[in-house]
């Protein structure tokens, strides 16, 4: 979590703000583990206990303002107040909070602006039945089949492209975390909870697919 916090801080601080910068953009892949650990410790030294505890939690949009509908698609003043009082580590958005590209980007931006500490802005975009963004035609996001279908028919090149494309398109909407892919190996065909959300029954094959997807999403600055 400490290193992840550093990456989010760097992502937000190096994001464009409409002005040219004379500072060279720092790439996280250029930093080794020891450097990241040191940066993380420096950041957390300046954080209060309340803020540190808050970083352990990811909340839904509805939990930030329970007076509003769970289908909320805009940031309310209460949401901003809640984030200020309870500095959560991240916010997850579901399909009911995602309507159009402009609306989604505005919402993720306003939530980030309302938080003292940069947020993990998360979504579930696995492909197939769990596609919070691509399932909405108005979002015009590239749709992918189920993990089962990907594992059965995609080669390494297509899998890498899938990770890159998902990462790029999610980043454009203001997300920096994808709660995917599912790493479960399908060991029980009667497990309907996982079902076609798994890439297959072979653990090595599943591990290779997961690794490829995650690496390519991370290249787009999406935590996965």
Predicted regions and their residues:
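Short coil/turn connectors at secondary-structure junctions
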Residues: 53-54, 88, 116-118, 219-222
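A short, Trp-centered hydrophobic/proline-enriched beta-strand micro-motif
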Residues: 55-59
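Enzymes and membrane/adaptor proteins characterized by extended Gly/Ser/Thr/Asp/Glu-rich
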Residues: 62-66, 72, 82-209
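Phosphate/pyrophosphate-binding betaalpha-module
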Residues: 209-224
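Sec-dependent N-terminal signal peptides
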Residues: 1-9
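C-terminal motif of bacterial Sec signal peptides marking the signal peptidase cleavage site
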Residues: 13-16
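N-terminal, intrinsically disordered, polar/charged segments of Gram-positive cell-envelope systems
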Residues: 19-46, 52-54, 69, 77
């Amino acid at each position: 979590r400490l290193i992840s916090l550093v990456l989010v801080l760097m992502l937000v601080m190096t994001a464009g703000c409409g002005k040219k910068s004379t500072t060279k953009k720092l790439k996280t892949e250029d930093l080794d583990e020891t450097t990241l650990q040191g940066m993380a410790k420096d950041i957390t030294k300046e954080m209060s206990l309340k803020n540190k505890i808050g970083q352990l939690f990811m909340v839904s949009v509805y939990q930030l303002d329970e007076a509003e509908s769970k289908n909320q698609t805009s940031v309310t003043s209460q949401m901003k107040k809640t984030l200020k009082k309870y500095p959560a580590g991240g916010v997850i958005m579901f399909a009911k909070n995602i309507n159009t590209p402009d609306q989604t980007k505005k919402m993720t931006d306003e939530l980030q602006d309302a938080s003292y500490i940069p947020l993990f802005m998360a979504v579930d975009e696995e492909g197939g039945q769990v596609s919070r963004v691509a399932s909405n035609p108005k979002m015009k996001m590239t749709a992918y089949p189920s993990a089962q279908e990907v594992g059965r028919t995609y080669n390494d090149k297509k899998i890498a492209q899938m990770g890159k494309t998902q990462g790029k398109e999610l980043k454009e909407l203001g997300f920096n975390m994808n709660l995917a892919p599912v790493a479960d190996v399908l060991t029980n065909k009667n497990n309907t909870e996982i079902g076609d959300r798994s890439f297959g029954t072979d653990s090595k094959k599943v591990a290779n697919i997961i690794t490829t997807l995650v690496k390519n999403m991370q290249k787009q600055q999406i935590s996965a």
